[in-house]
Amino acid sequence: MNFKEGEVLYFDKPLKWTSFAVVNKIRYHICRKLGVKKIKVGHAGTLDPLATGVMIICTGKATKRIEEFQYHTKEYIATLQLGATTPSFDLEKEIDATYPTEHITRELVEEALQRFIGRIEQIPPVFSACKVDGKRAYDLARKGEDVELKAKTLIIDEIELLECNLPEIKIRVVCSKGTYIRALARDIGEALNSGAHLTGLIRTRVGDVRLEDCLSVESFPEWLDQQEIEEVINE
């Protein structure tokens, strides 16, 4: 392996880790293994701290391929709690409002999900990395400032209802770059004349890379020790 020339690695991001923390940890182990102070390492698509699953990490010259990977179709398994919302649309923030769910049936859920298939407009969450006048939306939101984000056009190829244990549902979503599953949860809640927030999220696929192809961050140092590494010549 030649991490400077460029390698593409697949990881299962651990729960509560930021994407940035995963990149830092992988960079640390690679630098330590190679005996160098720095090497380029980047990820091809952020996952929220409360999400787990497929994360593609590129090293060295392969970081030029990051944009290519970002455009790959993604698949998620999401668990939604109906009848309650949070400001972040997931469990990062406390419940701020509750709504009735007595009227919701499996048929109603199936029907609502169908409305989101195809090209849709989605307003990103204010607790997101979207930029407003050059500043991250989440930085402004955490300061208590009002944040207005514009709707983005995206494509949802598939939505499948996997489990329906009302008021909780589990769905599989296949979607394009830029889709916020947290925002989709919010919109599904509204489509059901209720509210909803995300209680679990796993990214199961990015392009052809599946969860079973991924290394754990924990096992990476051991895996690294078993690889044949090309020596890095400091320029």
Swiss-Prot record:
Give me any GO biological process, just one: mRNA pseudouridine synthesis
Q: Which CDD domains match?
A: PseudoU_synth_EcTruB
What NCBIfam families does this protein map onto? TruB (TIGR00431)
According to UniProt, the reaction catalysed is: uridine(55) in tRNA = pseudouridine(55) in tRNA
Which PANTHER family does the record cross-reference, listed alphabetically? PSEUDOURIDYLATE SYNTHASE TRUB1 (PTHR13767:SF2), TRNA-PSEUDOURIDINE SYNTHASE (PTHR13767)
Q: What taxonomic lineage is listed for the species of origin?
A: Bacteria, Pseudomonadati, Bacteroidota, Bacteroidia, Bacteroidales
* Physiological role: Responsible for synthesis of pseudouridine from uracil-55 in the psi GC loop of transfer RNAs.
Keywords, ordered alphabetically: Isomerase, tRNA processing
Gene field: truB
A Gene Ontology molecular function term for this protein is: RNA binding
Q: What class of enzyme is it?
A: isomerase
The family database entries (InterPro entries) matched by this protein are listed as: PsdUridine_synth_cat_dom_sf, PsdUridine_synth_N, tRNA_psdUridine_synth_TruB, TruB_C
What is the protein name for this chain? tRNA pseudouridine synthase B
Q: What is its EC number?
A: 5.4.99.25
One Pfam family for this entry, by name? TruB_N
Q: Which domain of life is it from?
A: Bacteria
Q: Where is the active site?
A: D48
Alphabetical list of Gene3D superfamilies matching this protein? Pseudouridine synthase
Give the family per the record: Belongs to the pseudouridine synthase TruB family. Type 1 subfamily.
